[in-house]
């Protein structure tokens, strides 16, 4: 399912000990479920046509840690299969049917990945608060089995706009994989589960509800 709140939510208040010792920073950290891939067949995949074809599948399975948390609600994963036509520097991406708006100020993105020990690298693609596309992370996929990949959102990706009343935060666009030319032959398989965001909901919680949004 898309964009559901996970169970773990907590508000944290920390004190910045400045000269007066009375500067407080408040955070309301939430683990936000972007997609659990129970409807993975609604996703799409793409790659340059002259390098090969990529297809996706919804199939049963998942990392043991995730399945153990709720077997009835965590039955399916997203799988992608690439069939290369020739070697080179191709890429492929998997994307949801539409961008997913993540509420609040996103601290990090994470996803469980089942790798096949290829030298490929993975990034998240997002829109910033102004709709500008951005790539986040450059994570190695040279491992076997399931691994939870977590990427911090850098400060240079704009998530707040205080000169108008707009929806704050970023939107998730998809997962992008750059293929190492040494591995761009034959077939390649990769699987994903439990796409999450760790987000600070403080700004959303304390936004004035009667202030209209500048989204028209």
From Swiss-Prot:
Biotechnology annotation for this entry: Has shown promise in a 4-component vaccine with BHWA1_00430 (AC C0QY54), SecA (AC C0QZS7) and BHWA1_00569 (AC C0QYX7).
Organism from which the protein derives: Brachyspira hyodysenteriae (strain ATCC 49526 / WA1)
Protein's name according to its UniProt entry: Putative flagellar filament outer layer-like protein
GO BP of this protein: bacterial-type flagellum-dependent cell motility
Pfam families, per database record: FlaA (PF04620)
InterPro entries according to UniProt: FlaA (IPR006714)
GO cellular-component term (any): periplasmic flagellum
Residue ranges, compositional bias (Low complexity): 8-22
Region (Disordered): 1-22
Function noted in UniProt: Might be part of the flagella.
Domain of life: Bacteria
Keywords tagged on the record: Bacterial flagellum, Periplasm
């Amino acid at each position: 399912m898309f964009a559901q709140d996970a169970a773990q939510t907590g508000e944290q208040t920390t004190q910045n000990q400045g000269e007066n010792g009375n500067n407080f920073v408040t955070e309301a950290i939430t683990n936000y479920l972007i997609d659990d891939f129970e409807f993975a067949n609604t996703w799409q995949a793409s790659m340059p046509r002259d390098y090969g074809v990529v297809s996706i599948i919804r199939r049963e399975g998942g990392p043991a840690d995730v399945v153990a948390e709720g077997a009835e609600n965590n039955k399916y994963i997203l799988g992608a299969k690439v069939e290369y036509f020739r070697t080179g520097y191709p890429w492929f991406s998997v994307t949801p049917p539409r961008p997913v708006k993540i509420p609040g100020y996103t601290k990090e993105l994470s996803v469980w990945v089942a790798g096949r020990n290829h030298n490929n690298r993975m990034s998240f693609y997002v829109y910033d608060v102004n709709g500008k596309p951005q790539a986040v992370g450059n994570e190695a996929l040279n491992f076997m089995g399931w691994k939870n990949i977590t990427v911090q959102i850098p400060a240079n990706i704009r998530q707040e706009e205080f000169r108008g009343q707009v929806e704050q935060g970023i939107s998730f666009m998809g997962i992008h994989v750059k293929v190492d030319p040494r591995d761009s032959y034959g077939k390649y398989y990769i699987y994903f589960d439990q796409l999450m965001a760790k987000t600070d909901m403080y700004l959303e919680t304390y936004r004035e509800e009667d202030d209209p949004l500048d989204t028209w």
